[in-house]
Each structure stands twice: as structure tokens, then as C-alpha cells.
Regions:
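Iron-sulfur cluster-binding electron-transfer modules in prokaryotic oxidoreductases
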Residues: 12-270, 275
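Conserved AMP-binding A3 loop
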Residues: 278
Length: 278
């Protein structure tokens, strides 16, 4: 929120990117590492899942207290990232199950007015984090965000489409944050081409479930209509699903990227419609 709060509109995030760009020029080891990651992104994500699985196995065997002590010592000695009980388990989207569910949905819609239901498709691009990381071991929620999003879309009658080669795609935020702006733009261009094809040249809406990712996508992709979850639900699913308000309190955290994009009102409207205690 730095630029929104500053009377001069100064964005310290952009300044940080410029400084990092100077510190990591092309040819530096850091830049080469970033370029390697961009070119082998699918492999890096695939390699991360076993690491998360191993950490979850260790947590299950050792328990929280012992796991915390051991990993804290490893962090102090080896400098590895600090483990916490909130670390997520590995996750991957089951494309085969999605295909079966889409076929079932397609057959169900065929019994109705095909002209009305033929357009009920959405291109869903889960963020890299939500493609790779699931829930913590002791999470009170049973379904990972991507699985829950797919189930909600299909419940609303929408066939879910993923862009081709989704494992290697990224909006570029990772590299933008490190000052590698040319690599970030290259990844954005790859994503735009894949989404353009998947949406049949903008015929179907595109949904992304992570607001910082969507913020960058909206800055670099202009040929398609891009939605975040609350906005998509309010626009397309509100009249196709029955929402029953709960008495449980709901906490709403609005990120700075959401405030910049403007769909905050949709989030508040959805929250008010689903909970009496906001």
C-alpha cells in the first residue's frame, strides 16, 4: 500500500526492483540462476513437491516439537529455510479427474439448451504456489484452494479449461521481484499466448486465484478479460448457486494488489452475503 498511502504516489516496490536489477545484471550468477529457473520451471516445481512431501513425512514421524527443534538447528548450522508447522504439503492438480468431471458436466449440459450452456467454460490458471503447495498437516480445511475452486466452478455448471503446458507457465512476478524484468516479461508473454489459445482468442473468461499474480497479469495482458475469484463469483456464479449465510465469523484480508486492481467491493459483497459476522 506504499504508493496508495504516499501523497506523491511513490511506489517503493518499483524502486526495489530497479535497485535489484542493477545488483543482478545479465551475466551475473544470480541472473543466470533466474534464467535457468525460468527455462526449467516445470522441473523445479516437480522437484519441490518431494521436498514438501519429505518435510510432511518428518512432521508426521517426529511430531511438531521434535521437528521444530531439529529443523531450527539445521537452519542455524546450514542456513536452510526455517520450518514451521504451517508449511504446506505437496499438491498437484489431477488433470485426469478434471477431464472425467468435465465430461460428466458436458453430458449433463447436453440435456439442456445447448445454445445457452455451450458458453459455460472458464480458463482457470491456478497460481504457481497453488499448483505446487497444498494445505498444512493440521489444517482445519480438507480441500486445497485449487481443488475447491474447480469444484465450485463445476458446481456452477462451468467446464474448467487449463492452458497447455501449465506446469511451465508463470505470470513473471517471481522474476520481477528480483529485478529480472526481461525474464519476467518473457514469462508473461508465454502465459499470454497460452491463455489466448485456451480461451479461444478471448471467447471465455480467464480466472486466476492469486491477487498479486493477477495484478501483474492485468498489467501485461490486455487482450482478455481476467478475473479474481470474488469478482468471478459475483459476476458469473451469483445467480447459478445458492449461498447460505453462516453464523461463523469471517475475517477478510484485502491485499494491496487487490486494492490497486479495484475488486475490493466484490470481496466485501461476497463476504456480507456469506456471513452475518464480518
Amino acid at each position: 500500500l506504499c504508493s496508495m498511502s504516499c501523497p506523491m504516489g511513490i511506489n517503493t516496490g518499483d524502486l526495489t526492483h530497479i535497485i535489484r536489477q542493477k545488483e543482478l545484471p545479465q551475466g551475473s550468477m544470480g541472473y543466470k540462476a533466474g534464467n535457468f529457473a525460468a527455462n526449467h520451471f516445470a522441473g523445479i516445481k516437480s522437484a519441490l513437491r518431494p521436498v514438501l512431501g519429505l518435510a510432511n513425512l518428518g512432521h508426521s514421524v517426529l511430531g511438531t516439537k521434535a521437528m521444530s527443534c531439529i529443523t531450527k538447528g539445521m537452519h542455524n548450522v546450514l542456513g536452510i529455510p526455517l520450518w514451521t508447522p504451517a508449511m504446506p504439503k505437496a499438491y498437484s492438480i489431477k488433470s485426469s479427474q478434471l477431464a472425467i468431471d468435465n465430461d460428466t458436466l458436458r453430458n449433463k449440459n447436453a440435456d439442456k439448451d445447448s445454445a445457452a450452456n455451450g458458453q459455460l467454460k472458464v480458463v482457470y490458471f491456478p497460481s504457481c504456489i497453488n499448483q505446487t503447495m497444498g494445505l498444512p498437516k493440521k489444517s482445519p480445511v480438507e480441500q486445497a484452494l485449487a481443488s475447491k475452486m474447480i469444484a465450485l466452478l463445476q458446481k456452477g455448471g462451468y467446464e474448467v479449461i487449463f492452458p497447455e503446458n501449465m506446469e511451465k507457465l508463470c505470470c513473471g512476478t517471481i522474476w520481477e521481484s528480483k529485478g529480472m524484468l526481461d525474464i519476467a516479461d518473457r514469462k508473461s508473454a508465454e502465459l499470454e499466448a497460452a491463455l489466448w489459445k485456451a480461451s479461444e482468442q478471448g471467447r471465455y473468461p480467464v480466472l486466476c486465484d492469486q491477487s498479486p499474480c493477477l495484478h501483474r497479469m492485468r498489467e501485461t495482458i490486455h487482450k482478455m478479460k481476467l478475473y479474481e475469484p470474488a469478482e468471478f463469483i459475483y459476476t458469473f456464479l451469483r445467480n447459478r448457486l445458492v449461498f447460505t449465510p453462516t453464523d461463523r465469523p469471517v475475517a477478510v484480508h484485502i491485499t494491496c494488489s487487490m486494492r490497486k486492481m479495484g475488486p475490493v467491493s466484490y470481496t466485501h459483497l461476497r463476504a456480507h452475503e456469506t456471513s452475518q459476522d464480518l
